[in-house]
């Protein structure tokens, strides 16, 4: 999982093991921790053997036989189950081209179950947070999420979530993509994939839940009360169209007046 990759900022195939408010032993079949906003879980230990076999097949060539890292891929020991789940479920890993500056989102090569199995194996090497999140969106405040998004996310992903170019040939991916799930949004915020900031201590679980609700709600399913969203790229396109119509209208009026005189 290349360190220079910019990931965007994914709910797929995760079973809820409970809503424990405090951390329990990591890696166990019922290990959970979290809050009323987000519960973090770990795949059961029974997944580890299958996960190890998958890791050797799809991951070890870049990350090493024991996930210790190589010149082709970073050390994965201690990254947490949530990190592994994000990269695999978004299709960024296994990488088709390890030399790419940025691994793009693509259809996942491994199933959600297989992602959990690999996450269980990697987490067993050095149990760590974050776990795999279950987001309780029914309690979210979408208005607060919109404000938090504008303060913490819009600088890279733009205020409309359409994504934008960054330095060194990388980009912040679009969050308008309906394939981006609430689970992946939380995982990205909590793990900071590639050079995305890790908001582990800056945002509470409730704030992350609110941002997630906004992204998977209004950004991915806009109401467009104006009728036409002009590609959803924000006020620049809207201003340009308004200017074009306004100037064009004035030109026609001026031509009409001049023709009459």
Task: Briefly describe each language-model feature range.
Residues 1-3, 20-57, 68-71, 79-83, ...:
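Short sequence/structural segments immediately N-terminal
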Residues 1-46, 221-261:
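N-terminal export/targeting leaders of redox proteins
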Residues 44-48, 52-75, 86, 90-96, ...:
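Periplasmic/extracellular electron-transfer cofactor-ligation site
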Residues 77-126, 169-223:
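Extracytoplasmic electron-transfer domains, predominantly the class I c-type cytochrome c fold
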Residues 102-107, 131-138:
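Short acidic, glycine/Ser/Thr-rich loop/turn "cap" segments at secondary-structure junctions
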Residues 129-135, 200, 225-227:
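Surface-exposed patches in mature extracellular/periplasmic domains of secreted proteins
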């Amino acid at each position: 999982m290349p360190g220079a990759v910019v990931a965007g900022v994914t709910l797929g195939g995760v079973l809820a093991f409970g809503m424990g408010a405090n951390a329990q032993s990591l890696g166990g079949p019922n290990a959970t921790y979290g809050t009323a906003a987000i519960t973090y879980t770990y795949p059961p230990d029974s997944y580890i053997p299958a996960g190890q076999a998958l890791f050797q097949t799809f991951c070890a060539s870049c990350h090493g036989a024991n996930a210790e890292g190589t010149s082709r891929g970073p050390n994965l020991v201690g990254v947490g189950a949530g990190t592994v789940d994000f990269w695999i479920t978004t299709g960024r890993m296994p990488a088709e081209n390890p030399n790419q500056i940025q691994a793009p989102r693509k259809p996942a090569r491994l199933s959600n179950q297989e992602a959990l199995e690999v996450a269980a194996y990697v987490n067993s090497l050095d149990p760590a947070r974050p776990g795999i999140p279950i987001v309780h969106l029914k309690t979210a405040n979408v208005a607060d999420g919109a404000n938090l998004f504008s303060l913490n996310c819009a600088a890279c992903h733009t205020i409309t979530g359409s994504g934008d170019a960054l330095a060194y040939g990388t980009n912040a991916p679009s969050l308008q993509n309906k394939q981006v799930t609430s689970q992946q949004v939380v995982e990205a915020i909590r793990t900071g994939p590639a050079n995305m900031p890790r908001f582990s201590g800056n945002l509470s679980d409730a704030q992350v839940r609110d941002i997630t609700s906004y992204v998977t709600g209004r950004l991915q399913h806009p109401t467009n009360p104006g009728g036409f969203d002009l590609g959803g790229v924000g006020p620049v396109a809207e201003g340009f169209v308004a200017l074009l119509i306004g100037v064009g209208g004035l030109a026609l009026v001026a031509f009409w007046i001049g023709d009459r005189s």
